[in-house]
């Protein structure tokens, strides 16, 4: 997990959606969560209006917990479907 750092923009694949957020796979090695509050600044009634299972999108790494290996992601500050990583 050392190659992934907070504030990085990374490509992820959406693997699951719940009422509280979306689960994403990172490089087939790690899993992350995009909490519903990190999808848009506006009210999100249905996450599927923004992303769906199987979508390959870009997300910003907000937090990495090295102890639990949990990665918190966000898409609300980037163009998550068109962003190109530098």
Language-model-derived ranges and their functions:
Residues 1-86:
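Single-stranded RNA-binding regions, centering on S1/OB-family and related RNA-binding modules
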């Amino acid at each position: 997990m050392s190659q992934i750092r907070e504030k990085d923009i990374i490509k992820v694949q959406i693997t699951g959606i719940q009422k509280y957020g979306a689960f994403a796979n990172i490089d087939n090695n790690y899993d992350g969560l995009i909490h519903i509050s990190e999808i848009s600044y506006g009210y999100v009634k249905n996450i599927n209006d923004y992303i769906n299972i199987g979508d390959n999108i870009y997300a910003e790494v907000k937090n990495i917990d090295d102890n639990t290996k949990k990665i918190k992601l966000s898409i609300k500050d980037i163009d998550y479907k068109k962003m190109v990583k530098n």
